[in-house]
């Protein structure tokens, strides 16, 4: 572990020199990439330097204890030695976590896609409830939410809704929401009071920048059509809606939320870039995931990850066996208790994998 930490510190010092190099300063892309790399290892280097400093103090205190001291001085040295040993242990644990490979997408913004699945109108209503839950959560964290496209049902639900979430750590926290969400409740239209089960799927995609995934015009087919509202009726006479097809992957994105064809195409391109990036990244991870199944699930959007039971005011996350009797609060966007537990489980699993590899 310490060889790796020393290598990280050496790289940090090298980056410091590079960032003051005129050739780097004059190259915006390289400057941004190196600054991002340095920012990503700063906490590790600072903690490692603190650890080395504590180690030096421990050695000095050991030497002091080997000398002839009066009782009071010896007692003080022993107390200091014990405190330093505890601090060293704490720093070692922090360093282990800091060495866990960071998801390169954690700092990215999020494209959120929610679709009503099994359950008809009730599934669409639940999709709407999930979107409102995530919107409130985003507000609590100071993130901005922008609806990019929506297919409302007319009864307060959505067959599909796509939104952009902009803010610090958005992907690092929202990525655990990928999967199928199940709801158990009595629909408002149910006169007999029977509990129905419906599902909605949630897709969390990191926003991909143009420099990360290049889409060539020759690989994209663009179709335009008239926008439609709930029920399928045409809502305008202009061909403002846009459908983009990425021919190599077959990925299709439609966008009709804006009255402007140009704005719809711009939004569709953002979603298309994110979906293509997500596809390539998933394929690259397949071999790794085959050797190590994540403690918090595979991230497959068909995987049932959570159940929301309204009659019992209960939410259960099936990946980590966590049950919370606070469904009313969860639906108001108070998701940190669940997400923090998922992050801890994920970090613990990665740390165990790291220890096994060593």
Curated annotation (Swiss-Prot):
GO molecular function, one term: translation release factor activity, codon specific
SMART domains, sorted: PCRF (SM00937)
GO CC aspect terms: cytoplasm
Chief site of localization: cytoplasm
Modified residues (N5-methylglutamine): 233
Designated name of the protein: Peptide chain release factor 1
PTM notes: Methylated by PrmC. Methylation increases the termination efficiency of RF1.
Subcellular location: Cytoplasm
NCBIfam families (UniProt xref): prfA, PRK00591.1
HAMAP family: Rel_fac_1 (MF_00093)
Organism: Listeria monocytogenes serovar 1/2a (strain ATCC BAA-679 / EGD-e)
Superkingdom of the organism of origin: Bacteria
Encoding gene, per UniProt annotation: prfA
Keywords: Cytoplasm, Methylation, Protein biosynthesis
Family note: Belongs to the prokaryotic/mitochondrial release factor family.
Described function: Peptide chain release factor 1 directs the termination of translation in response to the peptide chain termination codons UAG and UAA.
Gene3D superfamilies attached to this UniProt entry: 3.30.160.20, 3.30.70.1660, 6.10.140.1950
């Amino acid at each position: 572990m310490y060889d790796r930490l020393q290598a990280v510190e050496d790289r940090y010092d090298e980056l410091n020199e590079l960032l003051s190099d005129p050739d780097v300063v004059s190259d915006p892309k390289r400057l941004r990439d190196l600054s991002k790399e340095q920012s990503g290892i700063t906490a590790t280097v600072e903690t490692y330097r603190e650890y080395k400093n504590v180690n030096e103090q421990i050695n000095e205190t050991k030497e002091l204890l080997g000398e002839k001291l009066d009782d009071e001085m010896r007692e003080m040295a022993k107390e200091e030695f014990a405190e330093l040993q505890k601090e060293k242990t704490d720093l070692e644990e922090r360093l282990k976590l800091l060495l866990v490979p960071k998801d390169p997408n954690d700092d990215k913004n999020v494209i959120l896609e929610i679709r009503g699945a099994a359950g008809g109108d009730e599934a669409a209503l639940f999709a709407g409830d999930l979107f409102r839950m995530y919107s409130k959560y985003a507000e609590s964290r100071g993130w901005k939410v922008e609806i990019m496209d929506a297919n409302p049902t007319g009864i307060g639900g959505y067959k599909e809704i796509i939104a952009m979430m902009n803010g610090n750590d958005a992907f690092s926290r929202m990525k655990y929401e990928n999967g199928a969400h199940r709801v158990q409740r009595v629909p408002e239209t149910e006169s007999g009071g029977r509990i129905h089960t419906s599902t909605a799927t949630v897709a969390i995609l990191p926003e991909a920048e143009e420099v990360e995934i290049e889409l060539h015009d020759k690989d994209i087919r663009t179709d335009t059509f008239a926008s439609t509202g709930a029920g399928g009726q045409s809502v305008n006479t202009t061909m403002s809606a846009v459908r983009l097809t990425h021919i190599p992957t077959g990925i299709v994105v439609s966008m009709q939320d804006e009255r402007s064809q140009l704005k719809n195409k711009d939004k569709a391109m953002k979603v298309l870039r994110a979906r293509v990036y997500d596809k390539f990244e998933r394929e690259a991870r397949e071999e790794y995931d085959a050797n190590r199944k994540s403690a918090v699930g595979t991230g497959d959007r068909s995987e049932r990850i959570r159940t929301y039971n309204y009659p019992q005011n209960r939410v259960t996350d099936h990946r980590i066996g966590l049950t919370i009797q606070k469904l009313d609060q969860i639906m108001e966007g108070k998701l940190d208790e669940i997400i923090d537990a998922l992050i801890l489980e994920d970090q613990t699993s990665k740390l165990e994998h790291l220890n096994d590899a060593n």
